[in-house]
Swiss-Prot record:
InterPro entries given in the database record: ATP-synt_VA_C, ATPase_a/bsu_AS, ATPase_F1/V1/A1_a/bsu_N, ATPase_F1/V1/A1_a/bsu_nucl-bd, P-loop_NTPase, V-ATPase_su_B/beta
Keywords: ATP synthesis, Cell membrane, Hydrogen ion transport, Ion transport, Membrane, Transport
Upper taxonomic lineage: Archaea, Methanobacteriati, Methanobacteriota, Methanomada group, Methanococci
Name of the protein in question: A-type ATP synthase subunit B
Molecular function GO labels: ATP binding; proton-transporting ATP synthase activity, rotational mechanism
Family: Belongs to the ATPase alpha/beta chains family.
Membrane topology: Peripheral membrane protein
Subcellular location: Cell membrane
Length: 462
């Protein structure tokens, strides 16, 4: 679009439906372009082009289409895509889903204005995810180790404490090493006012806000803003990582609300629906978010992602968790059964997996015994869980002494490793020491996954 076209105001709005309006007789308009809208009473609004074909453009209005009409509404196409002004001063601030200050502070003086869609990374320019990120949560650090540049989702369900877990991770997460700079970018999408107050209060009262940038999109905010929020958050994270050399952890919650907004917009555009009514391009759209995690050659900083999503009806085969699993590098699954037992955080380590855990474990990263002792504990816990089903049928009296030790181990594992306080920040050394303590429950001859050298070095003497 040339400079002359940017000054043209169109009054050829032919149709308004829900949050969308259709403008006829336009030319040179591109998909994703930002639109300035003037209402009949002179109020200014903003929109974005969702579809451009021939001489027609379909525009989603961020603030909604109330008070707009087809005869007096004026539209100007800016020729620019959605951008956000970024600055190091964003740390310690809270913004709405569109990047406007929500904490009563001043507007940010931008050091740069960046396209919120990011820029495609050549796969050759990527470094593999590496180095340990400590969350202070034993079931993540120990069994599902998070590494810099990784993307690993948390699969939760309605009513499970994923919000509490998200704020605990944001508060406790850190990278180990002298002089390493670390920050958290937290983006909440489609949340209630109560949840918003909870997040803001937690960040403020715990001091976590000092090293964080927070974006809040409420359930009654426009659906198109919900689409922008994670992109704005990731653009901020990329700036802090690749321009300021920081290691950035991005926590996105709730991706289910994001996908519902995608479905809402697709329905308003009368698109042909895919699985369960979601648009056919949802996989591509999610990939555009998740693939912005990583490490770039020649850049000091990294972007690590923990997207959180609630599985409708606890169905892990639902399109949202299903497609997410194809793109990301594992998953952390919250269990309703563990939650009913009063266990927090209710992380079920058996279906959980970090495909890149090995990149962050071992001497110089965590500890030399990490992978072996966790493998031993995982196998013992899995056997103990299986024995619970057997006990339900034949009773505990029918078990051998060996079986009873594994059953006891499974209970102790849940009560001392999985369970931890909401304010309990465990180092990886503490987690591994707790695991070794539990292994004393098992007969020595059952410790087949750890070497004699490691047993001599770490196993407490009875």
């Amino acid at each position: 679009m040339d400079a002359m076209q940017k000054t043209i105001e169109y009054t050829s709005v032919s149709r308004i439906a829900g949050p969308l309006m259709v403008i006829d007789g336009i030319e040179g308009v591109a998909y994703g372009e930002i639109v300035d809208i003037t209402t009949p009473n002179g109020e200014k609004r903003t929109g974005q082009v969702l579809e451009a074909r021939e001489e027609i453009a379909v525009v989603q209005v961020f603030e909604g289409t109330s008070e707009l009409n087809t005869s007096e509404t004026k539209v100007r196409f800016t020729g620019d895509t959605a951008k956000i002004g970024v600055s190091y001063d964003m740390l310690g601030r809270i913004f709405n889903g569109a990047g406007k200050p929500l904490d009563g502070g001043p507007e940010i003086i931008a050091e740069k204005k960046l396209d919120i869609n990011g820029y495609p990374l050549n796969p050759v320019s990527r470094n593999p995810p590496n180095a340990f990120v400590q969350t202070g949560i034993s079931t993540i650090d120990g069994t599902n180790t998070l590494v810099r540049g990784q993307k690993i989702p948390i699969f939760s369900g309605s009513g499970l404490p994923h919000n509490k877990l998200a704020t605990q991770i944001a508060r406790q997460a850190k990278v180990r090493g002298e002089g390493e700079q670390f920050a958290v970018v937290f983006a909440a999408m489609g949340i209630t006012g109560e949840e918003s107050n909870y997040f803001m209060d937690e960040f403020k009262k715990t001091g976590a806000l000092e090293k964080a940038v927070v974006f809040i999109n409420l359930a009654d905010d426009p659906a198109i803003e919900r689409i922008l929020t994670p992109r704005i958050a990731l653009t901020t994270a990329e700036y802090l990582a690749y321009e300021k050399g920081m290691h950035v952890l991005v926590i996105l919650t709730d991706l289910t609300n994001y996908c519902e907004a995608l479905r809402e917009i697709a329905a308003a555009r009368n698109e042909v629906p895919g699985r369960r009514g979601y648009p056919g391009y949802m996989y591509t759209d999610l990939a555009c978010l998740y693939e912005r995690a990583g490490r770039v050659k020649g850049r000091e900083g990294t972007v690590t992602q923990i997207p959180i999503l609630t599985m409708p009806d606890d169905d892990i085969t639902h399109p949202i968790p299903d497609l997410t699993g194809y793109i990301t590098e594992g998953q952390i699954v919250l269990s309703r059964e563990l939650n009913r037992k009063g266990i927090y955080p209710p992380v079920d380590i058996l279906p959980s997996l970090s495909r890149l855990a090995g990149n962050g474990q071992g001497e110089g990263k965590t500890r030399d015994d990490h992978s072996k002792v966790i493998s031993q504990a995982y196998a013992a816990y899995a056997e103990g869980r299986g024995l619970r089903d057997l006990v339900a049928v034949v009773g505990e009296e029918a078990l051998t002494e060996r079986d009873r030790s594994f059953l006891k181990f499974a209970d102790a594992f849940e009560n001392s490793i999985v369970t931890q306080g909401v304010d309990e920040d465990r180092s990886i050394e503490e987690t591994l020491d707790y695991v070794w303590d539990l292994l004393t429950i098992l007969p020595r001859e059952e410790l087949k996954r750890v070497s004699d050298e490691l047993i001599e070095k770490y196993l407490p003497k009875k």
